[in-house]
């Protein structure tokens, strides 16, 4: 299980994993780094819709994870 929620005031994000979910998430991160790419995680596919607590958090329905190589970050910082 991989789950992203906004906290009750909408200013923070909570990321919740079970044992399999954290392994999947690490694999996603390794893959986008290796491929110099990005990844979309969607509710109903990679992201769980399961309610895991009684708090007032809101499910995040879409997460985009982007890898920016260090050289790109230095270049854009220098250009600005």
Predicted segments, located by residue:
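Positively charged, low-complexity terminal tracts
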Residues: 1-80
